[in-house]
Design a protein with these regions (language model features):
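Extended intrinsically disordered or low-complexity regions, especially N/C-terminal cytosolic tails and loops
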Residues: 1-121, 249-261
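Surface-exposed polar/charged interaction patches
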Residues: 40, 44, 83, 87-97, ...
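Non-transmembrane, amphipathic alpha-helical segments
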Residues: 72, 112-126, 182-185, 217-220
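Amphipathic alpha-helix face/heptad-repeat signature
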Residues: 80, 123, 130, 186-189, ...
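Short, hydrophobic, well-ordered secondary-structure elements
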Residues: 120-144
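Flexible secondary-structure boundary motifs
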Residues: 137-215, 234-239
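Amphipathic, Lys/Arg-enriched alpha-helical patches that create a basic surface
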Residues: 199, 211-261
Length: 261
């Protein structure tokens, strides 16, 4: 699985090279404003654009060691999704290690290593939470701030769930519905993802036994991460084509545990 591309929050394709721009057409008032900006430590609240060879991307300024830097604003949807994929990169390896190196009931002799469990579940939780964040950040970006959420009885919803946003609100805004037709099969996986994420965030030990977290651990071991990653990509790209793309560099990057020498 190749690593996903990171993308800017906004970009505009251009059919000219930035070197072709004529400085003489810039109004004097704009030149004065630009000079004042460059010589002050005040950060801009206006749009800042970075001109590249084939496109313009939006960014923001940041003071670092008395220097005003211009940084590209990366779309958080692509950050969260990349985090999820990179967390998954070594997940199957550590799952296999955990299951093959653990003690078998009725047998003795295996050394118990908490790191085998810890490493797998760290990456598993990271992947789940970032996949959910991918969906929720996409919903929050798509839905206008002033949008009024209404339930099926016509009453206002004060705190809509992410499921309501994904399955009720976005289809109304986009006039297309991911739950219809051939995409239906992905919804069950997305529902399971959201439920598992909620179980993790609101984790509370079961009171019936002294191993209060075994339920969530079993669910994480059983969860189909690869299908969930594909389902989230399908959902996002259904509404915003090609927002989630694999990089063409051919390299696979993954988060891993590293022993400092």
């Amino acid at each position: 699985m190749g690593h996903p591309k990171l993308k800017a929050t906004r970009e505009i394709k251009i059919d000219f090279h930035p070197s072709e721009l004529d400085d003489t057409i810039v109004p004097e008032e704009s030149k004065v404003k630009a000079k004042d900006y460059l010589t002050s430590k005040k950060l801009a609240e206006d749009d800042i654009m970075l001109m590249l060879d084939t496109k313009v991307i939006y960014g923001y300024d940041y003071l670092y060691k008395d220097k005003k830097l211009i940084l590209p604003e990366v779309n958080p949807i692509t950050i969260f999704y990349a985090n999820a994929v990179m967390s998954y990169g070594r997940l199957e390896h550590y799952k296999k290690t955990l299951l093959t190196e653990s003690s078998e009931a009725g047998k003795v002799g295996k050394v118990v290593n908490l790191n085998h469990s810890g490493t797998f579940f760290q990456l598993a939780v990271n992947s789940i939470i970032n996949l959910q964040a991918t969906l929720e950040s996409f919903a929050n970006r798509t839905i206008p701030k002033e949008y009024e959420f209404i339930d099926k009885f016509g009453k206002t919803i004060i705190n809509p769930t992410v499921t309501h946003k994904l399955y009720n609100t976005i289809p109304k805004i986009k006039n297309i519905d991911f739950k219809q037709g051939k995409y239906k099969k992905y919804n069950k996986c997305i529902d399971s993802l959201i439920q598992l994420r909620n179980d993790i965030i609101h984790l509370k030990p079961a009171e019936k036994t002294n191993t209060g977290y075994k339920g969530i651990y079993r669910n994480l071991l059983d969860f189909d991460f690869q299908k969930a990653i594909a389902s989230v990509k399908m959902f996002i790209n259904f509404y915003e084509p090609d927002l989630i793309e694999e990089c063409t560099c051919g390299q696979n990057f993954a988060f891993d545990t590293v022993l400092n020498q």
